C-alpha cells in the first residue's frame, strides 16, 4: 500500500512537471504569437518581421531561463528551482520591454505590441508581489490567464473552454 502511494505521488509529480513545462509562459506566448500570425491578414505590413521579433523577445529569449534548471554545482532541488525562478523573471523583465521597443520601432502589427506590453506589465506586477511584497503569486497561472482572457475577448463564448487551462495550471504547479 505504501509503495503504491509513493508510485502514485511520483506519477502525479511527473505529470505536473510535464504540464508545467507545456503551460510555461514562453511556450504559451510563442503559441499565442503564432496563432495571431496565422490569423492576421497576409497583406498587413511587417507581419512576418513582427512575428519574428515577437517570437524572439516574447518566447525564445525568456525560454532560455530554463537553462537555469540545470543543477550544475548546486544539487539541492529547492535552490535550483529558486535560481530558475529568479532567472525567469530577469529574462522576462529585460526581454519583454526591449521586445516592445523593437516591435514599435519596426512598425510591427499592433497585436504583437499589445502582447509585449501586457506581458511586461504582468511580469512587473508579479515581481512586485513576489519579491517586494513577499507573496508567492503564480507566474504560470498569470501566463495562462492573459492569453486565455485575450482569446475570450476576441472570440467570445466559443473560447471559454480555454478557462479550464487555469485550474489545470494551478494543479500542475502544486503537483510538480
List each model region and its residues.
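Helix-coil boundary and interhelical linker segments in multi-pass alpha-helical membrane proteins
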Residues: 33-51, 100-114, 151-160
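Loop-to-helix transition at the N-terminal end of transmembrane alpha-helices
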Residues: 45-60, 81-84
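The first (N-terminal) embedded transmembrane alpha-helix
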Residues: 19-39
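Membrane-helix exit/interface motif
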Residues: 68-72, 98-106, 125-133
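Alpha-helical transmembrane segments in multi-pass membrane proteins
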Residues: 53-61, 91-95, 118-122, 126, ...
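Membrane-embedded catalytic cores of phosphoryl/pyrophosphoryl-handling enzymes
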Residues: 113-176
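Short, Lys/Arg-rich, polar N-terminal cytosolic tail immediately upstream
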Residues: 1-16
Amino acid at each position: 500500500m505504501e509503495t503504491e502511494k509513493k508510485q502514485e505521488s511520483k506519477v502525479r509529480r511527473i505529470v505536473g512537471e510535464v504540464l508545467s513545462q507545456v503551460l510555461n509562459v514562453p511556450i504559451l506566448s510563442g503559441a499565442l504569437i503564432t496563432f495571431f500570425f496565422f490569423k492576421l491578414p497576409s497583406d498587413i505590413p511587417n507581419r512576418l518581421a513582427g512575428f519574428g521579433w515577437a517570437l524572439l523577445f516574447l518566447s525564445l529569449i525568456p525560454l532560455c531561463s530554463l537553462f537555469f534548471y540545470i543543477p550544475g554545482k548546486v544539487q539541492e532541488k529547492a535552490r535550483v528551482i529558486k535560481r530558475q525562478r529568479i532567472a525567469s523573471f530577469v529574462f522576462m523583465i529585460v526581454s519583454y520591454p526591449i521586445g516592445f521597443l523593437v516591435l514599435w520601432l519596426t512598425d510591427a502589427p499592433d497585436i504583437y505590441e499589445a502582447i509585449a506590453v501586457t506581458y511586461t506589465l504582468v511580469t512587473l506586477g508579479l515581481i512586485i508581489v513576489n519579491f517586494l511584497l513577499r507573496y508567492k503569486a503564480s507566474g504560470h497561472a498569470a501566463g495562462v490567464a492573459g492569453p486565455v482572457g485575450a482569446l475570450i475577448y476576441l472570440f467570445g463564448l466559443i473560447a471559454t473552454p480555454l478557462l479550464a487551462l487555469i485550474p489545470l495550471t494551478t494543479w500542475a504547479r502544486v503537483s510538480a
